[in-house]
Amino acid sequence: IDHAWMSAPTFPPHPHAGFSAVTYLFLDSETGMANRDSLGTRNLIEPGGLHWTAAGRGVVHEEVPAATGSTTHLLQIFVNLPEARQNAAPFALSLASQDVPVLQLPGARVRVPLGSYGELHSPLAPPTDVTLLDITLEADAELAIPVPAGHRAFVMPVNGSAEIDGAGFGLDDLGA
């Protein structure tokens, strides 16, 4: 996982193969990311939106801030493809910000760009089972996140700190 702020082109067009590259823009981004790839995909990933590139047997892509000088705040996540799909034809999935399911709770907002939380389910069906929750908590708010048997969880505070099962940590604890 790469947690980044970008305000200018950073990476020239580059190849990927055998895994998925997932880009999620946080709502506080000042601009979107212009995405293009060798499949002919050309789209704007808006703040709050997500783009999933399943590279399969190979794809070249580039993502740059749509407005140079304006900052994007994002996660770039590399997700392994199932072995049977690692040499499959590449494809891309996109989810606009307004299509991300949102649950507003007392003291918490949960956005579900991938996977599910409670009764909310992302409309995307990626080739790898992944849940991505963008959670905003008010001070001293609590939220239970059940982790199904056979799954693992990774929590990354991007602003402030959190306490999980009694252990406190913040972004600095991740070496970011």
Question: What kind of region is each of these model predictions?
Answer:
Residues A17-G40, E46-L50, A139-A141, P146-L171:
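Glycine- and acidic-residue-biased ligand/ion/polar-headgroup-sensing regions
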Residues N43, G49, H61, H73-L75, ...:
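Generic beta-strand structural signal
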Residues G56-R85, G168, A176:
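Ligand-binding loop in jelly-roll beta-barrel domains
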Residues L81-R109:
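Long amphipathic alpha-helical segments that form oligomerization/scaffold cores
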Residues P9-P12, S38-T41, E62-A67:
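Catalytic micro-motifs at enzyme active sites that drive phosphoryl/nucleotidyl and oxygen chemistry
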Residues N87-L93, L114, H121-P126, L143-P148, ...:
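A short secondary-structure junction signal
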Residues I1-F26, Q98-A144:
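A short glycine-rich, His/Asp/Glu-containing loop-to-beta-strand
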